Amino acid sequence: MINTRKNHPLMKILNESFIDLPTPSNISAWWNFGSLLGACLAIQIITGLFLAMHYTSDTSTAFSSVTHICRDVNYGWLIRYLHANGASLFFICLFLHVGRGLYYGSYTFIETWNIGILLLFAVMATAFMGYVLPWGQMSFWGATVITNLLSAIPYIGSTLVEWIWGGFSVDKATLTRFFAFHFILPFIIAAMAIVHLLFLHETGSNNPLGLISDADKIPFHPYYTVKDALGFLLMLFFFLSLVLFSPDLLGDPDNYSPANPLNTPPHIKPEWYFLFAYAILRSIPNKLGGVIALILSILILAIVPFLHNANQRSMIFRPISQCLYWALVADLVTLTWIGGQPVEHPFILIGQVASILYFSIILIFMPLATILENKLLKW
């Protein structure tokens, strides 16, 4: 008898990825976030598709089309808030997923890690362009400020900004192209996620101990399908609680005012998930320096595998590195808070100290801590 699951060309791929996949028997709940990110992407694509059916990417009608979705379309308010808060959920899962990779040394799978960094950049670009689409005050000014940063690039900066804008300011052409890119990027992200999985399945999953687990692997189904389903239900509970009880908690009130180029909001800031990078950008007085620091704040993740000089892969038995890791987490929380504050004393100074600390922990303190830990283990 032929087993279709194992012999059918298409089913075979799915079987080897989600059913008979040999998985370490000791992976914890921190390994749930990969599947949760897949669920987030599915939610975003489905809700986004329904929103795109009613949205118009024209400066004169964009804001009112979003209002129309919320007021006149059946369950339009729900679709809109699922999509807006789905982005926040996506980033919560992303940060936890990257955090888990850093803690347990998953970055030693260099190809998987690098595709992950590209995915992070793609998701950030998609979220930024999506924030512009409702054409509220913060949408317009956020787009103006962030795209204007490219003018810091020597020689070609100003031309590049005008090329992205499609004119001499953020206007109709900008909104139309942002909508086009915002629509196509999630499908590119889905394709990249498949490549991410492809590279992961070449090496197999890491585990909390950071040890080779070939001798002790179990099939993905039913053990981890059930575990992922539980994670998904828990995520859905918190997500729907946010959407149905407090949908505007993470948004900006300024975005309920239509975009007005003649009236600048007192404090321009992006969504909460970009605030840590925004704080790093603002903490450097020089424009070009700020832009470089902004890009490096994410790109620094690509250097992490080359800074790894510990005898153990995971941080689970490395207490000094653990302390530094949690200091880094606290530092990122501080940067997120600072990014949402006005540019005045003492926030400027706190932001500068937190920015220096962010780069110092990753580039200097963590490698030094691993050298010390290696010596202590020998001793």
From Swiss-Prot:
TM region positions: 33-53, 77-98, 113-133, 178-198, 226-246, 288-308, 320-340, 347-367
Entry's Gene Ontology BP terms: mitochondrial electron transport, ubiquinol to cytochrome c
Cell compartment(s), UniProt: Mitochondrion inner membrane
Obligatory cofactor(s): heme b
One GO location term (cellular component): respiratory chain complex III
Membrane topology, as annotated: Multi-pass membrane protein
Entry similarity comment: Belongs to the cytochrome b family.
Protein name: Cytochrome b
